[in-house]
Amino acid sequence: MKTILSSETMNIPDGVTIKVNAKVIEVEGPRGKLVRDFKHLNLDFDLITDENGKKKLKIDAWFGSRKTSAAIRTALSHVENLITGVTKGFRYKMRFVYADFPINASITNDNKSIEIRNFLGEKKVRKVDLLDGVSIIRSEKVKDEVVLDGNDIELVSRSCALINQKCHVKKKDIRKFLDGIYVSEKGAVVVEE
């Protein structure tokens, strides 16, 4: 069954400006600017003003199936992530896990890449270049922890995945050999009191 019109709106917080140009959403805030392309979705994006004068983003789906109606909520979640990115930012913390051989990691290239040494006692140096807009630092408080910061949640989480995949244990039982670098905490760069 097709629904004639399904739509949802979301509030735009103060200090954030949103521009809509043919399914390309541009969000600008105190931490920078993010652009997201929704051309693959059969949705209409509009900026509206409610009776109180507050700006809102409205997403419509005309004659959509259940999948199209579900895509509305997905698009709203993506825009919410963009707003969170330009206001608070995203911070992922990764911990080094090892049993015998301590993992040595050095951050190079102006906090844009990491080199991993002595993983499972191997001599090979594993180098991971982070995606654009993501920076990495060593944690001062916690031993064997790195912190990844960025505005785009997808770039930060994909950079974490690249680091995690570089430390993949091969030809051993992964239930026994739990060595690696794993995400331990996800949060915002700007923490509200």
Swiss-Prot record:
Q: Name one GO biological process term.
A: cytoplasmic translation
A single GO CC term for this protein reads: cytosolic large ribosomal subunit
UniProt KW keywords: Ribonucleoprotein, Ribosomal protein
Q: What molecular function does GO assign, one term?
A: rRNA binding
Q: Which domain of life is it from?
A: Eukaryota
Q: Is this entry keyworded Protein transport?
A: no
Tell me, what's a Pfam family for it? Ribosomal_L6
What family name appears in the similarity comment?
A: Belongs to the universal ribosomal protein uL6 family.
Q: What name is this protein filed under?
A: Large ribosomal subunit protein uL6
